[in-house]
Amino acid sequence: MIRECDPNLDIAMTTNGSLLSKYADELAKSGLNRVTVSIDAIDDQLIREISNSNVSSKKIIDGIIAAQNAGLKIKINTVIIKHFNEDQIIPLVELFYRMRVVVRFIEYMDVGGTQNWNANQVVFGDEIREIIEQAFGRLTPVN
């Protein structure tokens, strides 16, 4: 329906990925071009704590694979929280590098006071970059 308004329109969505394996083909056939999946950990316990749900990393990753197979462009958004999921940076980079999926690390920020945000929990972009570069060497920009 949206695609009919403009055949060149870039249609995207952001999701936690929990239903993506079920709907990726249908979404692609409906005209979706790309999807951003929010995943803040590979560790299932951390995912449960962050999302307050029982979604597993396997379910999310299976959804990402289904989206790839459906021809959708994919990006990953990951929020890193100091002393909580910092240890997930390298496993996330390794996994999505192997899958050829771009990961964007996003600084933890106040979203209206709904998550008991604390400035001391912020891991800044340069800190994340340093952790990654210590493990893999100098990073280069991706367009």
Name the predicted role of every residue range.
Residues 1-102:
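Radical SAM/AdoMet-radical enzyme domain recognition
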Residues 94, 98, 109-143:
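Auxiliary Fe-S-binding modules of radical SAM enzymes
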